[in-house]
């Protein structure tokens, strides 16, 4: 039976990532995410991080909702369910280890996938001569 492969981010195990400081973790990220962390967290992002830390301790019971789609997913967020706003509603996003280093907004799609129905009368040349019920 195949064993599940242990998760590693840039050669570091999840436990090592949890013990790293934010500055050390930022050095492992791609340039765009590293730049956004280097410039500092916005007040909304700091508020979100505070709520996540409270929820981990069990002191925040409500679902965590945020508009901060540009928040980089940090190792301390893993295991949480965060409701991310997509422009219309809050989409629940369960944070997994593989999501580390991505943005929250990547997992809450803003556009709906088109579900085309059957074409109407007159939609094609051949349907012009189909009798309407």
Swiss-Prot record:
Q: Name one GO molecular function term.
A: structural constituent of ribosome
* Role description: Protein S19 forms a complex with S13 that binds strongly to the 16S ribosomal RNA.
Question: Keywords of this protein's UniProt record, alphabetized?
Answer: Ribonucleoprotein, Ribosomal protein, RNA-binding, rRNA-binding
Q: Which GO terms describe its cellular component?
A: cytosolic small ribosomal subunit
Pfam families the UniProt entry points to? Ribosomal_S19
Q: Which domain of life is it from?
A: Archaea
Q: Can you tell me which family this protein belongs to?
A: Belongs to the universal ribosomal protein uS19 family.
UniProt protein name: Small ribosomal subunit protein uS19
Query: Matching Gene3D superfamilies, A to Z?
Result: 30s Ribosomal Protein S19, Chain A (3.30.860.10)
PANTHER family from the UniProt entry: RIBOSOMAL PROTEIN S19P FAMILY MEMBER, SMALL RIBOSOMAL SUBUNIT PROTEIN US19
The alphabetized list of GO BP terms reads: ribosomal small subunit assembly; translation
The keyword Ribonucleoprotein is assigned to this record: yes
Q: Does the keyword Membrane apply?
A: no
HAMAP family listed in its UniProt record: Ribosomal_uS19
Please give the organism.
Answer: Thermococcus onnurineus (strain NA1)
Q: InterPro entries under this entry?
A: Ribosomal_uS19, Ribosomal_uS19_bac-type, Ribosomal_uS19_CS, Ribosomal_uS19_euk/arc, Ribosomal_uS19_SF
């Amino acid at each position: 039976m195949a064993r599940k492969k242990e998760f590693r981010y840039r050669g570091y195990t999840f436990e090592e990532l949890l013990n790293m400081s934010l500055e050390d973790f930022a050095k492992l990220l791609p340039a765009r995410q590293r730049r956004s962390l280097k410039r500092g967290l916005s007040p909304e992002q700091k508020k979100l991080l505070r709520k996540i830390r409270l929820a981990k301790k069990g002191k925040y019971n409500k679902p965590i909702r945020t508009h901060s789609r540009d928040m980089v997913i940090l190792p301390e967020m893993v295991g949480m369910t965060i409701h991310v706003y997509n422009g219309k509603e809050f989409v629940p996003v369960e944070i997994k280890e593989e999501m580390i280093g991505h943005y929250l907004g990547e997992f809450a799609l803003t556009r709906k996938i088109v579900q085309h129905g059957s074409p109407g009368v007159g939609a094609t040349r051949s349907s012009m001569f189909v009798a309407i019920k």
